[in-house]
């Protein structure tokens, strides 16, 4: 995976969050060369113009996309581009706690203020939404709250789960995982309930299997019947 910054960022001090960072020609060359090497490509892009340049270049995914407009979503539909939104409820408090510079807090507030509206429009337009983490911005694992955010924004619960399983596998080009099928990696999680009815249970993982090996089992030692009643499993 080759990732580029098509627009400014939230945590950088000197640029505008939505300003384009690369020309169309530069993005065309970047994507062409990456794809020639068999690499997937992703673009950090908050602003619409920078994102549209990346989409026209054939980028595989747009990350964040806080200020995407209707033209951007139409281009994504035509090009088959994935959208990886990163609605992070923790970010504003994290920045305040860290005593971040005022301009960074201002940029974060602008992006955060548009993120949910953009996500709702993306869902309404049937965008190809994949699940991302924006790793290290919020503590690892807290991103599980995105399942509930996706559903509150209009996505069906099973579609939200697929965004983190089969959709992510397709985006990243890893066909040996993402669905529960013979011959694929046994990557499983279990939750205490039915996430198709209550997506919030996705934040209550108690069992994790990676490649057929159990790496977490909070119910180890509990009778077999007790471990299965009222629980659901999902494949990664």
Residue ranges and their predicted role:
Residues 65-70, 87-91, 213-214:
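Short, acidic/turn-prone active-site loops that include or flank metal/cofactor-
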Residues 82, 86, 90-109:
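Active-site loop ensemble at the mouth of alpha/beta enzyme cores that anchors a bound cofactor
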Residues 164, 182-226:
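C-terminal cap of metal-dependent C-N hydrolases
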Residues 36, 40, 100-103, 111-195:
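His/Asp/Glu-enriched, well-ordered alpha-helical/loop segment
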């Amino acid at each position: 995976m080759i990732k580029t910054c098509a627009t400014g960022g939230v945590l950088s001090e000197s640029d505008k969050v939505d300003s384009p960072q690369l020309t169309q020609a530069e993005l065309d060359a970047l994507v062409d060369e990456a794809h020639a090497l068999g690499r997937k490509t992703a673009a950090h892009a908050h602003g619409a113009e920078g994102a549209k340049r990346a989409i026209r270049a054939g980028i595989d995914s747009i990350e964040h996309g806080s200020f995407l407009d209707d033209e951007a979503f139409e281009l994504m539909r035509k090009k088959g581009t994935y959208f990886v939104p990163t609605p992070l409820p923790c970010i504003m408090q994290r920045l305040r706690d860290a005593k971040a510079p005022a301009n960074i807090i201002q940029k974060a507030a602008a992006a955060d203020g548009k993120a949910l509206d953009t996500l709702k429009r993306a869902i309404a337009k049937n965008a190809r939404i994949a699940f991302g983490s924006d790793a290290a911005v919020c503590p690892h694992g807290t991103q599980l709250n995105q399942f509930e955010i996706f559903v509150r924004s209009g996505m069906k619960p099973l579609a939200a789960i697929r965004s983190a399983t089969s959709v992510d596998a397709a985006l990243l080009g890893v066909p040996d995982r993402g669905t529960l099928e013979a011959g694929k990696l046994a990557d499983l999680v279990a939750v205490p309930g039915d996430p198709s009815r209550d997506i919030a249970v996705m934040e209550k993982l108690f069992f994790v299997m990676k490649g057929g090996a159990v790496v977490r089992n909070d119910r180890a030692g509990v009778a077999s019947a007790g471990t299965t009643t009222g629980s659901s499993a999902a494949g990664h």
